[in-house]
Structure formats: C-alpha cells, structure tokens
UniProtKB/Swiss-Prot annotation:
<dbReference type="GO" id="GO:0019281">
    <property type="term" value="P:L-methionine biosynthetic process from homoserine via O-succinyl-L-homoserine and cystathionine"/>
</dbReference>
<keyword id="KW-0486">Methionine biosynthesis</keyword>
<feature type="binding site">
    <location>
        <position position="192"/>
    </location>
    <ligand>
        <name>substrate</name>
    </ligand>
</feature>
<feature type="active site" description="Acyl-thioester intermediate">
    <location>
        <position position="142"/>
    </location>
</feature>
<dbReference type="GO" id="GO:0008899">
    <property type="term" value="F:homoserine O-succinyltransferase activity"/>
</dbReference>
<comment type="subunit">
    <text>Homodimer.</text>
</comment>
<feature type="site" description="Important for substrate specificity">
    <location>
        <position position="192"/>
    </location>
</feature>
<feature type="binding site">
    <location>
        <position position="249"/>
    </location>
    <ligand>
        <name>substrate</name>
    </ligand>
</feature>
<keyword id="KW-0808">Transferase</keyword>
<comment type="similarity">
    <text>Belongs to the MetA family.</text>
</comment>
<keyword id="KW-0963">Cytoplasm</keyword>
<keyword id="KW-0028">Amino-acid biosynthesis</keyword>
<feature type="active site" description="Proton acceptor">
    <location>
        <position position="235"/>
    </location>
</feature>
<comment type="pathway">
    <text>Amino-acid biosynthesis; L-methionine biosynthesis via de novo pathway; O-succinyl-L-homoserine from L-homoserine: step 1/1.</text>
</comment>
<dbReference type="GO" id="GO:0005737">
    <property type="term" value="C:cytoplasm"/>
</dbReference>
<keyword id="KW-0012">Acyltransferase</keyword>
<dbReference type="Pfam" id="PF04204">
    <property type="entry name" value="HTS"/>
</dbReference>
C-alpha cells in the first residue's frame, strides 16, 4: 500500500533508499482512488525516527494510504525541530470535524509517570473520546495501550518493578483470527516498557479478545470483536538498532540497565543486533489495514456508523 505523504517529508527519501514505495501528494493527486485516511498521533520524543518506523510498515500493500500526523503537546520539543512540527503536523482543532479510516496512537516514554501527571493527559482523553465517532479502527501501541485501557475500561496503571527490554517469543491463541492471519505459531517481537499487561487482567476486566501472548503470560495482541480497537503491547515498528540506542542512552545516564534480552548476538552489547521481528511487524500492520480498516470502513467517510460504546 503506497503511503501518501507531503512531498517534503524527510521520510520520503529515507524510505525510498530502502526501496519502500512512497507516493507523494503531487503524484497521488493524479489517481482517481479514494485513499484510506490514517491519522497518526505521534507521542514519541524523536518524532522523525518514529514516523519512519510506522510509515515503513504502512507501505506494504497495494492501496493508497493518506497519512496525517497529529500532535497534542504544544510544549517545545527537544528532539524534533519546530519547523518540522509546524510543516507536517496538525493540531487536534484542525481535524476534529473530520473522519478517518484508521488511527494509530504510538507509545511514549511515560511508563513511570502517573496518568494525571502526564502534561497532555486531558488531550489524550479528548482524542480517544473523539475517535469513537470519527475513526473506523484505532491501533494502540505500548504505553498508549495502558492509557486506552484506563480511559476506556477504567483499569488502573499496572507497572513492572524492572523494565522489560528485549526481543521475546510470543504464541498466537487464535490461528484463524483476522489480525493474526499468516502469523507463525510462535514469533518474536521487541518490548521496551515498564507497563505491565497480565493476560488475566485483560480477560477479567474487559470484553477484549486476546490474540497473542508472551511466553510469560502477558497479553501482547488483543482487540475488540467489532474490530474498532486493537492493542499491541510491544514495539513491532522498532528498527534493528532502536533497543541498542535506548540501552546505551541509559548506560550513559548512569541507570545501569540490564542488557536487552535475546537481542545482542551472544548477549554482548559490542555486537551488532539484527532485526528478527521484521516480517511479523509488516504482517501485523498489513492485517490491521486490510481486515480492521479497509474491509469495514465506508467508502464515504461522512456515513460512518460508530459502534464503540
């Protein structure tokens, strides 16, 4: 699915170097196709890096996806140039009257911060409430899963004593579920979080269906039966080097982090890591776009039929 982005977005050249099909707005305007409209609420500090990661995964299918980047934190960013934010991001007020086929809410490094202490917590709640009537399907990633479970289901914040960091094995519970279609029975995916997601908590306090778990019994992938909301507690979008960058950052900060599990060859941080989850990440996002977005969204977004209560 060629992603449709502004001509000047840095991700265009970055992804084309990887032979990823990116369609600029100027080229897409010549095609008489109704693209899928996908809104990305990017909560990560290094926004350009996160854009590249998600856009790479959204590009792997034959239909157009029109990407809109959203920000809700008006504070000055220390990691992303203001010019980039001003040129490529919209504010909530710019899109609140629009409808979208899909919404992705990224993770954020807020695992040890109480919800009410998050500077933009009211805006997070506003976007999630808005999405019930304006978005066909929403995908929450890592910290956003924890936030959504609290807002939508009233589940208190669950925090691990130690950070979960590394590449872990998972197994699917429903091999014929649409979101896991084509998955191997067991697959690898990276995690980097303090948030805790015991599968029993999801089963006992929500009506969500768990589709994949970690070997330790944590919920990894779960969704509502009507496909309106889906949750992934790991980071299938991560590059091969992302966990390494986080590890060495924490080492330099004197935090004495554990070496990410099952990541560096021979468990030696001096060795170059390789991505062992790339096919899983691509298939997950392709399935979400196809089965949770494309196949249930109306052709005319003005005729949305929200079912999420």
């Amino acid at each position: 699915m060629p992603i449709r982005v502004p001509d000047e977005l840095p991700a265009v050249n970055f992804l084309r170097e990887e032979n990823v099909f990116v369609m600029t707005t100027s080229r897409a305007s010549g095609q008489e196709i109704r693209p899928l409209k996908v809104l990305i609420l990017n909560l990560m500090p290094k926004k350009i890096e996160t854009e590249n990661q998600f856009l790479r995964l959204l590009s792997n299918s034959p239909l157009q996806v029109d990407i809109q980047l959203l920000r809700i934190d008006s504070r000055e960013s220390r990691n992303t140039p203001a010019e980039h934010l001003n040129n490529f991001y919209c504010n909530f007020e710019d899109i609140q009257e629009q409808n979208f086929d899909g919404l992705i809410v990224t993770g954020a490094p807020l695992g040890l911060v109480e919800f009410n202490d998050v500077a933009y917590w009211p805006q997070i709640k506003q976007v999630l409430e808005w999405s019930k009537d304006h978005v066909t399907s929403t995908l929450f990633v890592c910290w956003a899963v924890q936030a959504a479970l609290n807002i939508l289901y009233g589940i208190p914040k669950q925090t691990r004593t130690d950070k979960l960091s590394g590449v872990y094995e998972h197994h699917i519970l429903h091999p014929h579920a649409l979101l896991t279609r084509g998955f191997d029975d067991s697959f690898l995916a990276p995690h980097s979080r303090y948030a805790d997601f015991p599968a029993a908590l999801i089963r006992d306090y929500t009506d969500l269906e768990i589709l994949a778990e970690t070997e330790e019994g944590d919920a990894y992938l779960f969704a509502s039966k009507d496909k309106r909301i889906a949750f992934v507690t790991g980071h299938p979008e991560y590059d091969a080097q992302t966990l390494a960058q986080e590890y060495f950052r924490d080492v330099e900060a004197g935090l004495n982090p554990d070496v990410p599990y099952n990541y560096f060859p021979h468990n030696d941080p001096q060795n170059t890591p390789r991505a062992s989850w790339r096919s899983h990440g691509n298939l997950l996002f392709t399935n979400w776009l196809n089965y949770y977005v494309y196949q249930i969204t109306p052709y005319d977004l003005r005729h949305m039929n929200p079912t999420l209560d």
